[in-house]
Design a protein with these regions (language model features):
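Bacterial N-terminal signal peptides that target proteins for export
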Residues: 2-12
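C-terminal segment of classical bacterial N-terminal signal peptides
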Residues: 18-27
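Aromatic-rich carbohydrate-binding modules that target alpha-glucans
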Residues: 46-91, 104-111
Length: 137
């Protein structure tokens, strides 16, 4: 019994040492620059004061806001409003957090934060969001 316990401890220590020595799969997997296009739809088409809060997210460590004032919608199409932003330094982060908010935090579109976890290999990424729907399309 004692020998078996020692073997398990040795195996655990070996695996723990190996896992600390290697970066996670997400580390460095993102492109350095992401060109993000967000399409946003509100049922009543009431877009006044709505904007995006984006941040470069680390699972461990410090996050980094993309803009301290939020990202404004600057265009529109048949779906709704469009915002386009170029985000640099994404290769040092795990994913991109996104909140659709009204004004300076008067309200949020959905209660939970959304996270963009997949980006085009060239950094070009396009998503669609709907009012009150937490899914990223």
């Amino acid at each position: 019994m004692r020998i078996r316990t020692r073997k398990y401890k040795a195996l655990f220590l070996a695996l723990a040492t190996l896992s600390v020595g290697f970066p996670t799969i997400a580390s460095g997997a993102n492109p350095e620059t992401v060109k993000l296009t967000v399409h946003y739809q509100r049922v009543a088409a009431d877009y006044a004061s709505w904007n995006l809060w984006l941040w470069k997210n680390k699972l461990t460590g410090t996050d980094d806001a993309v803009s301290t004032t939020g990202v404004q919608f600057t265009g529109d199409d048949a779906y709704g409003k469009i915002a386009t932003v170029e985000i640099t330094g994404m290769d040092k982060f795990d994913d991109l957090g996104i909140i659709v908010r009204k004004g300076e935090w008067l309200s949020k579109d959905v209660p939970d934060d959304r996270f963009i976890t997949k980006f085009g290999a060239d950094g070009v990424t396009e998503i669609w969001l709907r009012q009150n729907d937490p899914t990223i399309y």
